[in-house]
Amino acid sequence: MSSRKILPTKLNLINLRKQIRLTRTIKRLLENKREVLLIYLREYANEYEKLYSEVSQLLKEVYETYLMGVSAEGISTVESYANSVPPSLQVKSDLKVLFGVRIPIVKLDENSIQPQPFGDIEVSPYITKSRDAIAEAFKKILELVEMESAIRSLSTELRKTQRLINAIDSYILPYYTSSAKYIKGVLDDRTREEFVRLKMIRKVLQRRRGENVGNR
C-alpha cells in the first residue's frame, strides 16, 4: 500500500506514530517469545538426545534377554506364550500448555500392565525379565513421543513467531514510518507555505498602513 493514499492530516500523523510505537512494542514481545521458545527447544532437544540413547540401550538389553529366552524355550513356545496373553496395555492422552503452545501428552496406564500375564505357567526367567523390561521401555518410548511432539509444536510456533517478526521488519514498520514521513513532509510544507503567506500579508498590511499615514 502506498503511503500517499493516506490523507496528510495531523490526526493521521498522530495515529501513525502511535501505531509505530505499538508495533515496536509488539516486536519486542515477539523477540522475547522467540528467545524463550529457543530456550525450551534446546532443553527438549538435550533431554530427547539423552533419553533416546537410554531407550536405545534399554531396547538392546531387552532384545538380548529375549533372545536368550527364545534359545531356552524355543521360538514356538515363546509364540504360544505371547498368543495366550490378551492385549491389555492402554495409554492416556492429555494436553499441556507451554508458553502458549499446546503440547499433546501420552502416558502409559500402569494399571493396564498385567502383573502375572503367564499365570501359573513356568517360563524362562529371561522371558519374564524381557517382558518386564519392555514394559519399562514402553514408558520411556512414550516419553520420547511426547518430547517429539513438544519439539515439533515449539518449532512450529517458533517459525510463526519469526514470520511475524519478519513481516513487521519488512512490511508493517516500513509502511508506517514511510507514511508518517510523507505526512510530516506535507504538513511541514504547508506550515512553510502558510508562514510565507502570512509574512506576505503582513508586509502588504504594513505597506498599506504606511500609505495611509502618508496620505494624511
Swiss-Prot record:
- What Gene3D superfamilies has UniProt attached to this entry? 1.10.287.3240
> What's the protein's topology in the membrane?
Peripheral membrane protein
Transmembrane as UniProt keyword: no
Localization (cell):
Cell membrane
- Please report a single Pfam family linked to this protein: ATP-synt_D
Q: Name one GO molecular function term.
A: proton-transporting ATP synthase activity, rotational mechanism
Q: What is its main location?
A: membrane
Q: Which UniProt keywords apply?
A: ATP synthesis, Cell membrane, Hydrogen ion transport, Ion transport, Membrane, Transport
Summarizing the function annotation, the protein's role is: Component of the A-type ATP synthase that produces ATP from ADP in the presence of a proton gradient across the membrane.
Q: How does it assemble?
A: Has multiple subunits with at least A(3), B(3), C, D, E, F, H, I and proteolipid K(x).
Provide the family line.
Belongs to the V-ATPase D subunit family.
Protein name, entry field: A-type ATP synthase subunit D
Which gene is the coding source of this polypeptide chain?
Answer: atpD
